[in-house]
Amino acid sequence: MLASDGKRIRVKEGTPQGGSASPLVANVYLHYVFDLWAQAWRRKRAHGDVIVVRFADDIVLGFQEKADADRFRAELTERMRKFNLELHPEKTRLLEFGPLAIDSREWRGEGKPETFNFLGFTHICVMKRSNGRFTVLRQTIRKRLQAKLNAVKAELKRRMHEPIPEQGKWLQAVVRGHIRYYGVPMNNPALALFRFRVGWLWHRALSRRSQNGRVLWDRMRRLIARWLPLPTVCHPYPLRRMIPTPTTWPTYQTLGWWFSTWLGLWT
């Protein structure tokens, strides 16, 4: 490891926090510690269907059988211990999720299925009003949305005296990048809220620098329409392209089974 004073330090374990190589090294490490082991466990020890999704150190697993989820969690805890790793006690949880979860929890009087956060989205079980079919609603995590708005507010303060076209180009890139990541079906309200709040922050910044008082909203609406992109869906529903469908199962049946699972969330 190269220290800030230029000295080289030999590190026997772990990776330096904040180092450019740390995510790469950690990902390679988890590939052998978790990925290969989880795939082998799914093939040899699972009784029902199992899906595994990992991004860096955030992992979501879906189980058709709750017994599989319980056994996997216990064995994963033991395996992590062998490599001096541990599951996050607050972020590791098991929850019932899917179309059958809605009916079974309602029958037991337990209310709606729990939600979970993954990759910036809150995942929610819902039934569409248009056709009554089950779908997974993905909404921008509120804390992430507010954190981004706080960052925009701070940067606008720094850029307060820049020409409006320069501010507009920067805000355009910010809003477009946000939409390109969070632009999924049924997340339009959160996208529209982000765009509206960015426009409101911009209006406040321009009003503070104006010698004539507040900028009129008629002018501000034209600036917003000129520079801030409208919300749009950039990523269609991933179910058909992401879920492996055995040739002997109809597509609708496959989707029902995959999301009639107990989800174990590990970090």
Predicted stretch roles:
Residues M1-T267:
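Non-catalytic terminal/accessory segments
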